[in-house]
Design a protein with these regions (language model features):
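Bacterial Sec-dependent N-terminal signal peptides
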Residues: 1-25
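Surface-exposed coil/turn segments at beta-strand junctions on protein surfaces, enriched
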Residues: 63, 121-123, 136-140
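Exposed beta-strand and adjacent loop surfaces of beta-rich binding modules
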Residues: 67, 90-92, 142
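Terminal connector regions
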Residues: 24-29, 34, 130-228
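Low-complexity, acidic Ser/Thr/Pro/Gly-rich terminal tails and inter-domain linkers that flank the onset
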Residues: 23-68, 75-81
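Short Pro-Gly-centered flexible turn/kink motifs
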Residues: 120-132
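The feature marks short-to-medium sequence segments in extracytoplasmic or secretory-pathway proteins
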Residues: 77-116, 121
Length: 231
């Protein structure tokens, strides 16, 4: 009986450690589009108080202790082909720091596989749903979701939540991620952060710098080969 209790305590401790580990370091957003979501009148009426004329409207709600539900509405009168990566929206979570400034508490990890990229068709006035991780901690603040679409940023409503303040620190996971490192190869830390934190036009700037870098490397190789052939 005592042994069983000890094992249970160790298991509880392990689970607690895992949960704490998920809440105390900045990680990449893993939102997942709910393919089984059926738009209801309730889901649509959620947007009734939104007077914004932006082409995309976003409402975030607390689903449970560990999940947010995020509803995304096509607010224009034409079809919206929303960019997706492996059924994930280009979405990260932000929170207000101790000074009241909005800061990212998640980052975006770009896929290296070309097949990962696609789009989600949303008819005019229609709503889709995605779900994203909800954090916990001792720091009471406001959170919101940031969506990047076609080099334009859209924000959800804000919600009062508790997080760990350590989430504001850019973790080693972020710095060691391929998306971050690829930008550093051709540019600097500032642009690397803009890219993984889904700033508008950041990826476009990276793409332009990357093309120039590839052209420079190609030219250097050509000169080297030309020199070797002469020798």
């Amino acid at each position: 009986m005592r042994r069983a209790k000890t094992i249970l305590n160790l298991f509880t401790l392990l689970i607690s450690t895992i949960i704490l580990g998920q809440n105390d370091k900045m990680k990449y957003n893993q939102n997942s589009i709910d393919q089984n979501f059926i738009q209801t009148e309730k889901a649509f009426s959620t947007f009734n108080n939104k007077t914004d004329d932006a082409k995309i409207l976003i409402i975030a709600e607390v689903e449970n202790d560990s999940i947010f539900s995020i509803y995304v509405k096509n607010n224009q009168n034409t079809i919206l082909n929303l960019s997706v990566q492996d059924s994930h929206l280009y979405l990260i979570q932000e929170a207000k720091d101790i000074n009241g400034n909005w800061k990212p508490i998640e980052y975006w990890r770009f896929s290296t596989c070309g097949n990962s990229y696609g789009s989600e068709k949303i008819d005019s006035e229609k709503v889709i749903k995605t779900e994203s991780r909800k954090y916990s901690g001792n720091f009471k603040t406001e959170i919101r979701f940031k969506l990047l679409e076609d080099n334009e940023v859209f924000y959800s409503n804000s919600l009062i939540c508790n997080i760990n303040s350590s989430l504001f620190k850019i973790s080693d996971e972020v710095k060691n991620n391929a998306s971050y490192q690829n930008v550093l190869r051709v540019s600097n830390k500032s642009l690397a952060e803009k890219v993984v934190f889904l700033e508008p036009n950041a990826f476009k700037e990276f793409s332009e710098k990357n093309k120039k870098w590839i052209a420079w490397v190609t030219e250097q190789n050509r000169k080297r080969n030309e020199k070797d052939n002469k020798n």
